[in-house]
Amino acid sequence: MILGLTTILLVCFIPLVFGAVTADSPAAVERERPAPVAKETNADRFRRGLGPLPPTRREHNNLSPRASSVPCTRLSNNVGMLQINRVSDGQKIGYLSARFNRRKAYTVHPRPAAALKVAVPPVTAFGVAINLVAENPPDSTHMFLGAVDDGQGNVGSGEAGVAILSGTSSVHANSPPSSSASTSLTLANHGGVESQIWTMNCQTRQVTAQWINTDNSHPQTTIFYDPAHEYLGLSGDLEAHSAAVSRRAFGVFITFVPE
C-alpha cells in the first residue's frame, strides 16, 4: 500500500518538474517580453497640452555641399586686382591686364602695376552671380568684364567652342548669350555676350565663372589662358579646344586681391 502511494506521488510530481516553464524557455521569454509601446502622435501630445513632436531627420545623399557655415563679412575695400594662377601647379602667372590684346580681348600681365582694377559687391553671398566692373577699363564704353561666344558652337563636353573674356555691356544673370549686347572684342563672326557670370567665394576670394549656352544649358566652365594668342577664355572641354585650336592653352584660377 505504501509502495503504491509512493508510485502515484512520483507519477504526479515528475510532469510538474519536467513540464515546468524555466526562465530560459520560449514561453517564459514570451511572457516577460514587454508589450509594444504605441507610437506617440502629435494628436496625443496636443490632447495633453504639449507641443508637437520634433521634426524627423532624414539623411539625403544628394544635398548640395555648402561652402562654409561661416557668414560672409563686408570687404573693407571692394576694389582690387584679379590674380591669375595656373591650375596644374598653382604658379602665379600674373594679373588680368588693363590692356587688351590685338583683338581687344583681356590678357595677362606679370606686374600688378599694369593690372585691371575691378569693383566687386562689398558682400558676396555664396553662389550668387555678380558683375565685375572695371575701374580703369581699356574701353570706357564697355566697363563690364564679360565673355563673348567665339562663334564656334556651344561650350561643353566634347565641344571646341569657347567664350573669350573682353569688355562688354551689361547682361542679366542666368541669361543665354545676348546678341543685342555690345562688346569691345573685334573677332569676326563672334556670337552673343554675357556679363553677370561670376561668383566669388567670400572667404577665399576665388572667382569662378558659369557660362550659359544658347539652349540654356549650364556646362561645367573652366577658365583658361592661351599664351599663344594671349587671351583668357571660358571652356567646357579644354582638351577638345586644345586639340582643335591651341595646344598651349591651360586652366587657370582667378583670385580677387583687394587694394
Model-derived features: where do they sit?
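N-terminal signal peptide
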Residues: I2, V11-A28
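Long amphipathic N-terminal alpha/beta scaffold segment
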Residues: I2-L3, G51
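Phenylalanine-focused residue identity feature
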Residues: F13, F18, F46, F100, ...
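Extracellular glycan/ECM-engagement signal in secreted proteins
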Residues: D24-L96, G158, A163-E259
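N-terminal "domain-start" segment
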Residues: L75-S170
